[in-house]
């Protein structure tokens, strides 16, 4: 059974959801949180915090713990890693993070002195909601959780982290930091920018007439993540700029192919558009094929509900 002391540095949606799951299962884990005074007070009201500290109290929160999870925005994670470089601890402390980019974070983590052990991490979970008020103990169920351990690190050295991830219902995937960043640029970061650009570039005439209210499900689905906050995404784009640019260039190439095919209609271009749609169909279907981890795939479930108050 999981036991020990876990310290969450930053206590937004993801950290509070982990704490909620731990509390709901009554695991013998001591939860320590590091955050602003307002958030610490709210976490105590919700029963999530056994101990709490301010960010500046690094001498206190870095000691007396088995696992430190850095759960703040990426640039703040880098600041916290720099602060930890100045701390000496007597026994091993595993340090991980939930940042959406890994190369720069893992380089900073590698500068920690033993017995700190840094394992870069990134759970593919979350939403456009950002605070502990939206905590969800089931948030991590069936999610992939990327880990980037230093080469030669035995899994036993970070077993508490792996056990916590398994308890939360996620599946560990080991990745090299650079490979992670290139992959997630395509699967997460570039789609965010496309969604943001789509929602932010509606024609002025359309907006002046309030025609955006006629948007169908497709537009609403494609722009849901346009509600995401700039502060978090600023850090992601600053630390994964090159990979995101490469992904955007690849996407732009696809859009250009659509433009070229449309431009040739009606005399030509029909076959080209047919192939573009076939390629899109195959790409979408590939999401639901068995995955590279234990043969798991995704499933799409549609639930028809009557549109009236109280249905959900």
PLM region spans:
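Interdomain hinge/lid region at the active-site interface
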Residues: 208-279
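Rossmann-like NAD(P)-binding element
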Residues: 58-89, 94-96
């Amino acid at each position: 059974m999981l036991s020990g002391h876990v310290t969450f540095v930053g206590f937004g949606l993801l950290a509070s959801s982990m704490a909620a799951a731990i509390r709901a299962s009554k695991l013998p884990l001591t939860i320590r949180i590091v955050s602003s005074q307002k958030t610490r007070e709210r976490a105590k009201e919700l029963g999530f915090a056994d101990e709490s500290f301010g960010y500046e109290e690094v001498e206190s929160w870095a000691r007396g713990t088995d696992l430190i999870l850095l759960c703040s925005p990426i640039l703040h994670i880098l600041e916290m890693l720099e602060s930890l470089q100045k701390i000496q601890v007597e026994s091993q402390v595993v340090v991980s993070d939930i940042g959406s980019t890994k190369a720069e974070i893992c380089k900073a983590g590698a500068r920690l002195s033993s017995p700190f052990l840094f394992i870069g991490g990134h759970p593919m979970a979350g939403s456009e909601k950002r605070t502990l008020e939206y905590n969800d103990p089931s948030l991590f169920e069936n999610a992939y959780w990327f880990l980037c351990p230093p080469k030669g690190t035995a899994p036993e050295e970070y077993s508490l982290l792996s056990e916590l991830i398994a308890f939360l219902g996620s599946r560990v995937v080991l990745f090299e930091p650079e490979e992670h960043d290139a992959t997630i640029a395509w699967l997460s970061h570039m789609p965010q920018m496309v969604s943001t650009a789509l929602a932010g570039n509606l024609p002025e005439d359309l907006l002046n007439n309030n025609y955006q209210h006629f948007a169908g499900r497709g537009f609403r689905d494609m722009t849901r993540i346009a509600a995401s906050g700039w502060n978090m995404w600023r850090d992601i784009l600053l630390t994964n700029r090159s990979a995101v640019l490469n992904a955007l260039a690849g996407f732009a190439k696809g859009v250009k192919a659509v433009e070229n095919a449309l431009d040739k209609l009606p005399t030509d271009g029909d076959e080209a558009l047919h192939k573009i749609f076939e390629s899109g169909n195959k790409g979408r279907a590939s999401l639901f094929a068995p995955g590279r981890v234990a043969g798991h795939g995704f499933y799409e479930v549609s639930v028809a509900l009557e549109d009236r108050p109280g249905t959900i």
